[in-house]
């Protein structure tokens, strides 16, 4: 699947557009910080991470992540010794040839274990800072793709 080269595929397996909200259980103060909700869980912390200079360098089975390291989330890999920040107020330094993306575009693969209590409540996974696109796999199964999720 190469959704990042398909201009029609901005979001795959995502919810329809909606207002941002945090659910609160009955009796909880819905005007307090989102972290106070019993129905909210941050996935911040140390994640397994593997950096690739190019998407073509990735292993076919990227769930193994040989040579992985720990990366704090939230953060960005440019501030942790990989690649360099890409900010410019003039012509962007990446070749522009839609819908094609250069093969040497850097890739970061993040992975972590997560256990949840199957209590019958619906879970919604939200990414508030992925840049520029993300492919989401759960237990090795593709479940979604999104661009510019921040």
Label each PLM-derived region with a short phrase:
Residues 1-90:
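Accessory carbohydrate-binding/adhesion or oligomerization-edge regions at the termini
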Residues 3-18, 29-34, 48-52, 82-84, ...:
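Accessory beta-strand-rich segments of carbohydrate-active enzymes
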Residues 97:
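N-terminal [4Fe-4S]-dependent radical SAM core
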């Amino acid at each position: 699947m190469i959704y990042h080269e398909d201009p029609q595929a901005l979001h795959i397996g995502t919810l329809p557009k909606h207002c941002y909200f945090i659910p609160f259980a009955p009796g909880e103060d819905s005007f307090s910080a989102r972290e106070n909700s019993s129905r909210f869980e941050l996935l911040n912390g140390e994640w397994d991470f593997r950096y690739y200079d190019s998407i073509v360098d990735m292993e076919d089975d990227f769930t193994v992540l040989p040579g992985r390291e720990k990366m704090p989330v939230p953060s960005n890999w440019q501030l942790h010794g990989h690649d360099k920040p890409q900010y410019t107020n003039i012509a962007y330094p990446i070749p522009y040839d839609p819908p094609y993306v250069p093969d040497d575009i850097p890739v970061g693969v993040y992975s972590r274990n997560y256990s949840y209590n199957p209590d019958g409540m619906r879970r919604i996974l939200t990414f508030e800072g992925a840049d520029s696109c993300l492919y989401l796999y759960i237990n090795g199964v593709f479940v979604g793709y999104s661009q510019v999720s921040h």
